A protein has these predicted regions:
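A detector of single, family-specific signature residues
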Residues: 1-155
């Protein structure tokens, strides 16, 4: 498999993200196919099956367990890679603990796997290697670059 990586520059690029190894990067590339198939990261997360299922009736909207659509192996690999990333990066760790305090730890793990899938998608789509300061979004700029005015103070 390592010889196959030399022929796949996208796999090498995805492996620059902490926690993402050869198997995860290769599976992500092969399952997704091409990033142009998807308009946004939300569609990638839905394709992989890392979004909640929805049961709606009238005005009632209930979000259930993850949809589990898509490749089960890729979903498993993304959850494992997200756990490795959480152990090695303080920003990811703090985000995980913030989610785990509000919800169960398993739900927080899946949320971090979804975040990883979206992050890998944007790295691939924009042709960038991982950078620790890099916050990728659909506009291709830092997500936290806007200033919000609230009651006379700036956040």
């Amino acid at each position: 498999m390592e010889a196959d990586v030399e022929k796949r520059p996208v796999t090498r690029q995805l492996m620059t993200h902490p926690g993402v190894g050869l198997l995860t990067a290769l599976a992500f590339e092969l399952v997704i196919g091409t990033p142009q198939r998807f308009h946004c990261g939300k569609q990638v997360a839905s394709y992989v099956g890392l979004v909640p299922s929805e049961e709606s009736s009238g005005d009632r909207r209930r979000l259930g367990h993850i949809s589990k659509q898509g490749n089960a192996l890729l979903r498993f690999l993304l959850v494992e890679a997200a756990q490795v990333t959480m152990r090695s990066h303080p920003e990811w760790r703090s985000r995980f603990f913030h989610l785990a305090m509000r919800r169960a730890r398993k739900i927080a793990k899946v949320a971090m796997a979804r975040k990883l899938a979206v992050h890998l998608y944007w790295m691939w789509r924009q042709g960038r290697d991982y950078g620790p300061q890099q916050k990728l979004g659909s506009q291709g700029r830092k997500l936290s670059s806007h200033v919000v005015q609230t009651r006379g103070s700036t956040r």
